[in-house]
């Protein structure tokens, strides 16, 4: 009898492994099989009976994981908080580690394999997977920072019910790089600008100076060439779905002007949230205090943010 009870309990544990539930909100592993491996994600489902609207959340640039955390910038849990708040309001969500990042690290054997379109094509496959899941009635995209451009591009390739842009850059990446590097000494910009313009034209650059290897090493050039092809304003203008553009006025990385540029492309007025920074939190206006929020995983989202997102999804 004791053995039978043990086996039943063990079976239940195996079934529940990878699933968690908090306050009626359930999280489970939700993965996408692609050529060469698996992209690992998390599905957060509200309490109650579906089908539910579902939002696919795409993280920002670099080593940012599904929760919005990065070994470079720190842990802020911003994207995880969005998922939880959506579920609390009856909306499911999918968030995932991009190929080459965190649990999905194994999909990239070499940095030179990765191009910007990989992220776009992966997201299209996620949209198709969610669209074929009977638990979901409609699919929305939430893209943060670089993830906003990736989500926008994916929305031009397949049908979605809406797109939420969070802290999306308004200019092509090559313009951003040139602008950021313009603060460097002239001898640096004299070297970097010609390299950027060559990459913009789709040509690789040999013999990059040692001091610029971190930016323009051979293995990253294919990604830069592919990324430079995309003009966010043009891409946003090609989306055939409802769009909302949300930007904080306390963002150290992306400006209100970026949001206005994107708004012109999409033919709408952006939503500007006073006091919100790049990681979607309410932050001090000084740079030091602002950056400290990047490493506070318990600091809540800006109080106005989720109302904007939830109202948009519910009304579209």
Predicted regions and their residues:
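Accessory cap/linker subdomain of secreted extracellular hydrolases
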Residues: 164-234
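Short, surface-exposed "cap/lid" segments of acyl-processing enzymes
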Residues: 49-51, 55-85
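Alpha/beta-hydrolase active-site loop
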Residues: 111-133
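Conserved alpha/beta-hydrolase
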Residues: 77-105
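Primarily recognizes the serine-hydrolase "nucleophile elbow" in alpha/beta-hydrolase
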Residues: 129-182
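N-terminal cap/lid segment of alpha/beta-hydrolase-fold proteins
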Residues: 22-50
């Amino acid at each position: 009898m004791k053995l039978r009870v043990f086996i039943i309990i063990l079976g239940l544990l195996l079934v529940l492994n990878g699933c968690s539930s908090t306050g009626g909100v359930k999280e489970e592993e939700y993965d996408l099989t692609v050529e060469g491996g698996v992209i690992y994600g998390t599905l957060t489902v509200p309490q109650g009976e579906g089908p539910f609207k579902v939002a696919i959340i795409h993280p920002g640039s670099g080593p940012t994981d599904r929760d919005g955390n990065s070994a470079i910038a720190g842990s802020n849990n911003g994207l995880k908080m969005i998922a939880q708040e959506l579920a609390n309001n009856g909306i499911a969500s999918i968030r995932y580690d991009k190929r080459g990042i965190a649990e999905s690290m194994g999909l990239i054997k070499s940095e030179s394999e990765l191009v910007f379109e990989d992220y776009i094509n992966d997201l299209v496959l996620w949209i198709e997977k969610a669209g074929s899941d009977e638990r979901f009635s409609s699919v929305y995209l939430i893209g943060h920072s670089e993830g906003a451009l990736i989500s926008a591009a994916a929305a031009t390739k397949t049908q979605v019910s809406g797109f939420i842009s969070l802290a999306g850059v308004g200019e092509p990446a090559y313009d951003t790089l040139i602008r950021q590097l313009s603060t460097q000494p002239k001898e640096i910009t004299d070297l970097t600008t010609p390299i950027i313009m060559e990459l913009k034209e789709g040509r690789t650059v040999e013999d990059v100076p040692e001091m610029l290897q971190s930016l323009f090493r051979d293995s990253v050039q294919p990604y830069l060439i592919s990324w430079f092809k995309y003009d966010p304003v043009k891409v946003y203008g090609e989306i055939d779905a409802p769009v909302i553009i949300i930007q904080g006025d306390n963002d150290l990385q992306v400006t209100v002007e970026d949001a206005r540029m994107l708004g012109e492309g999409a033919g709408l007025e952006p939503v500007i949230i006073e006091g919100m920074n790049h990681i979607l939190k309410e932050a001090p206006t000084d740079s030091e205090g602002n950056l400290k929020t990047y490493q506070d995983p318990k600091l809540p989202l800006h109080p106005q943010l989720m109302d904007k997102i939830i109202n948009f999804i519910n009304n579209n």
